[in-house]
UniProtKB/Swiss-Prot annotation:
This is Large ribosomal subunit protein uL30. One of its GO terms (biological process) is translation. GO terms for cellular component: cytosolic large ribosomal subunit. The keyword Ribonucleoprotein applies. It comes from Roseiflexus castenholzii (strain DSM 13941 / HLO8).
Amino acid sequence: MSKLKITYRKSAIGYSHDQKATIRSLGLRRLNSVVVHDDTPTIRGMIFKVRHLVSVEELPDRDAPADHPGDDMKR
């Protein structure tokens, strides 16, 4: 399962209480704090609700084999 790196970029001051609660539920406490969550529909829905306050990056799946050039030349 892939992971999502979520960074809290903009303050929730002036936004509705449920958006502030969503930020807290994601585990974000201070501006520029970063959390990593599994990529699930629940987390995606929370991110969608506060997409104007956070930035999101997909992290590569660590379980998948890495495709490195030159691996076929190793003995």
